[in-house]
Amino acid sequence: MLLSENALLVIDMQQGLFRGPTSLHSSDTVLLNIRLLIENARQAQVPVFFARHIGPDDSPFSKQSPLTQLIPELNVNAEQDIVFIKKYPSCFRDTELQLQLSQRGVKQLVIAGMKTEFCVDTTCRAAPEHGFRTVLISDAHTTMDNKYLSASEIIAHHNVTLAGPFVTLATAACWSFHSEK
């Protein structure tokens, strides 16, 4: 078990969302940035957590559904990485995430993934309540346009809204797992 003050949490980068019927904002760039974070975390011996969002057993997002499987480009290391299932927007609700982080001595959670206005937002707001300093990688989370706002507006809004009271913002290229202790 890797012990570290930092952990990387990649949220819901799964087939049915990332490769869904609606285009994501800057999906190629976001994926490259997430892969950079994963590589840097592994080099720094920082634990990497992957959340998979599932729905009811009779839904298209059941646990066994191909739609809930993580995208292969993440190169999940089954022997080292921690993959967990969640049913709610918060990665902490009814999961063992807090226990797993605490067992590894994690004090700071670095967050990336999707969707910005749902699970990324909720987890960023919940993490400090669970005692974690939180870093949101501003160019490593994404969503899609909705009826009222473009995806870029949603992302920009959340970066501004979450910064300060809930998270520290950083970019993937500027973030170093070695620099924060």
Predicted regions and their residues:
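N-terminal nucleotide-binding beta1-loop-alpha1 segment
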Residues: L9-Q14
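Active-site-adjacent betaalpha module
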Residues: M1-A7, F61-K181
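Short glycine-rich, polar/acidic loop-and-turn segments at beta strand-coil junctions
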Residues: I34, R52-G55, Y88
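Early exported N-terminus immediately downstream of N-terminal targeting peptides
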Residues: Q43-S59, S65
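Short acidic, Gly/Ser-rich segments with clustered Asp/Glu that frequently serve as metal-coordination loops
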Residues: G16-R19
